[in-house]
């Protein structure tokens, strides 16, 4: 926590085991900052307010952020992914969303996805937990085992997120499916379906 107080998200250990490993940032500080702001604003707006500052983030702003993330990562070539950005628990959801987006671009590019598919994948990745904004913060940040009722509420976040996005944005069906199904497993287990 002293490092965090001083503004350092983490440190690298330089010893005989790390010789020859070059650590590169996956995103530039500017792109990371923009992405965090967009994700924060997506979670922070007031659903019941008509005030302009409480309106959802514009689709254009989200798309520009996604483009910058994808282009920033693709321009770095082969990089060793550094995902040290899980800060404190209160900010976890924002950093988690960015980390999932970064990993999605890296995996999608590795599998040979075209740029348009990477944009859709990254949009779904960065917004995958948006449904959590409709849940009680006590459930999201619980420091105890959730009750059965709390677990059932938490398991609704993919559907809440997909419904919210469908009602407020014009993303592709693949983006909505990615948000809706991000806790589904190949064997049919998982949720919400």
Task: Describe the residue ranges of each PLM region.
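Acidic loop->beta-strand submotif enriched in PP2C/PPM serine/threonine phosphatases
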Residues: 191-193
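Acidic/His-rich, divalent-metal-binding segments that scaffold phosphate/diphosphate chemistry
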Residues: 18-155, 159-180
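His/Asp/Glu-rich acidic catalytic environments and adjacent acidic regulatory segments
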Residues: 1-14
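Glycine-rich beta-alpha junction loops
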Residues: 183
């Amino acid at each position: 926590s002293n490092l965090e107080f001083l503004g350092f998200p983490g440190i690298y250990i330089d010893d005989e085991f790390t010789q020859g490993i070059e650590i590169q940032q996956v995103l530039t500080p500017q792109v990371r900052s923009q992405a965090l702001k967009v994700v924060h604003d997506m979670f922070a707006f007031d659903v019941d307010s008509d005030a302009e500052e409480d309106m959802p983030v514009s689709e254009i702003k989200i798309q520009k952020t996604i483009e910058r993330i994808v282009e920033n990562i693709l321009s770095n070539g082969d990089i060793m992914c550094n995902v040290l950005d899980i800060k404190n628990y209160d900010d976890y959801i924002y950093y988690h969303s960015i980390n999932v987006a970064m990993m999605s671009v890296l995996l999608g590019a590795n599998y040979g996805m075209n740029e348009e598919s990477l944009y859709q994948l990254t949009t779904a990745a960065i917004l995958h937990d948006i449904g959590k904004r409709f849940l009680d913060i006590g459930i999201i940040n619980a420091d105890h085992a959730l009750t059965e009722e709390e677990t059932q509420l938490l398991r609704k976040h993919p559907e809440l997120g997909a419904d919210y996005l469908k009602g407020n944005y014009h993303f592709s069906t693949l983006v909505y499916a990615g948000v809706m199904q991000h806790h589904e497993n190949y064997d049919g287990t998982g949720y919400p379906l």
